[in-house]
Design a protein with these regions (language model features):
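Vicinal oxygen chelate
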Residues: 4-13, 42, 54-129, 135, 157-158, 164-168, ...
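A short beta-turn/loop motif at secondary-structure boundaries
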Residues: 34-35, 56, 88-91, 179-181, ...
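Short, flexible, solvent-exposed loop/turn segments with mixed acidic/basic and small polar residues
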Residues: 51-54, 120-124, 175-179
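Short loop/beta submotifs within extracellular cysteine-rich repeat domains
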Residues: 30, 50-52, 72, 154-156, ...
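A short linear hydrophobic-aromatic micro-motif
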Residues: 29-31, 50-51, 82-86, 174-175, ...
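N-terminal beta-strand motif that seeds the catalytic metal site of vicinal oxygen chelate
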Residues: 1-16, 60-62, 109-145, 150, ...
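Core segments of cupin and vicinal oxygen chelate
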Residues: 2-3, 9-49, 134-172
Length: 239
């Protein structure tokens, strides 16, 4: 319904600092088009694409690509979704956007703004394998009802490693967590050797946040914060 997952679009006030942070974690650069007039760069671990925009917008945004988005937006609206914005026209880069029940922004644009990476999906970063983009929401059921018609399959709630509900799809997996776990979206990474990875990151002077969700073992879990404020949760396993 939404098209092909493109990137997690993130606002940054200092794109150079953000790029340097993801480089230190082992992410690679992607080539970009000249669509955006503002400074823009894309970092990837082979699975996840992080679009860094030195521009003010609702951030982070889950961004998809679907050709003919001006017309396709009507198909999205048939699911009862009200568009929060529409920028369409012959002289515009067409895009539409809406919010899920938690307020998470989602954008669908007419064409890619970066190229595919040559990096293999198996070439994980120092953070481990990207697992899911997790969204804070007080109630899980409205999120399930919203996202399932858009191509996601919601799994049952689980309390390991914290209370969450996973929603899988062909392109990117989402999840929902309680705001008391962390009151912002998280990029979640998992690896069975996460303890060793965390020690490696510490040796590279990557700072660990003290806001690690309650119940997680700091020997095998860590919370990183990018310069622009993005939360990256590192854990041994998501299930």
């Amino acid at each position: 319904v939404l098209g092909k997952f493109h990137e997690i679009s993130i606002e940054t006030a200092d794109i150079a600092a953000s790029v340097a942070f993801y480089e230190r974690l082992g992410f690679s650069h992607c080539g970009t088009t000249d669509t955006w007039p503002h400074p823009y760069g894309v970092m990837t671990d082979g699975r996840l694409y992080v679009g860094l925009h030195q521009f003010k917008f609702p951030s982070p945004t889950v961004t998809y690509v679907h050709p003919g988005v001006a017309h396709h937006s009507h198909a999205i609206e048939k699911h009862g979704i009200e568009m929060a914005w529409k920028r369409v026209g012959e002289d515009a880069f067409n895009e539409v956007g809406f919010l899920d029940p938690s307020g998470q922004p989602v954008r669908v644009q007419e064409a890619p703004t970066h190229f595919a990476s040559e990096r293999e999906r198996s070439e994980s970063s120092l953070c481990g394998d990207f697992a899911e983009f997790s969204i804070p929401a007080a109630e899980f059921e409205p999120m399930r009802e919203f996202w399932e018609p858009l191509g996601f399959v919601a799994l049952g709630e689980t309390d390991a490693p914290y209370l969450r509900m996973s929603m899988t799809s062909d392109h990117i997996d989402l999840a929902v967590h309680r705001p008391r776990t962390l009151d912002q979206p998280m990029l979640v990474f998992a690896a069975p050797d996460m303890g060793e990875r965390i020690e490696r990151l510490r040796s590279l002077d990557v700072a660990m946040s003290s806001d690690l969700p309650r119940g997680l073992d700091p020997r095998h879990g860590a919370l990183l914060r990018a310069p622009e404020g993005t939360a990256l949760l590192l854990i041994s396993a998501v299930d």
